[in-house]
Amino acid sequence: IPEKPFICTECGKCFSEKRTLKHHIRTHTGEKPFICTDCGKCFSFEICLNRHYKTHTRERPFICTECGKSFSDKSRLRVHHRSHTGEKPFTCTDCGKCFSVKSILNHHRQAIHSGEKPFICTECGKGFASKHYLHGHKRTHTGEKPFVCTECGKGFASNYYLHVHKRTH
């Protein structure tokens, strides 16, 4: 008998329990059967709903020993702790860039390596890989420069260009 006999027909991922496969399938279907009674937000998994409830109660029992910042669950504290250690355990197999959070790696792969640009500027028709990049691009049309150098007062449309500029001081 195979160790993981339950196989997702969508992606081929294997599971040892049928219920785990059933939960996994929600990542493909988008099914979100768990609903927050406070705000109506929906979740695919009960554990995510329970974690979300803490945002309403403001309960943050997990405290960083380095800086005192508090978190609603242990996993968020663990991710935060990497900001102190510099640990980046998630590596992009396409370019080797490392990330401290898996979801940021996934976003990177989608935005940089997929070639897809589904976010289209209504002003000029240019496509972008993420909503974030489109939002930044829109500033080229509006002239908005919300990122300001504290040394000289010069404004920039993106945080990236502000950091590039700061190296000149």
From Swiss-Prot:
Keywords, ordered alphabetically: DNA-binding, Metal-binding, Nucleus, Repeat, Transcription, Transcription regulation, Zinc, Zinc-finger
PROSITE patterns cross-referenced by the UniProt entry: ZINC_FINGER_C2H2_1, ZINC_FINGER_C2H2_2
Gene3D superfamilies from the UniProt entry: Classic Zinc Finger
Gene Ontology cellular component annotations, sorted alphabetically: nucleus
One Gene Ontology molecular-function label: DNA-binding transcription factor activity, RNA polymerase II-specific
GO biological process per UniProt: regulation of gene expression
Pfam families: zf-C2H2, zf-C2H2_11
Localization (cell): Nucleus
Keyword Signal: no
Zn-finger segments (C2H2-type): 6-28, 34-56, 62-84, 90-113, 119-141, 147-169
Role description: May be involved in transcriptional regulation.
Family to which the UniProt record says this protein belongs: Belongs to the krueppel C2H2-type zinc-finger protein family.
UniProt-recorded name of the protein: Gastrula zinc finger protein XlCGF62.1
Organism: Xenopus laevis
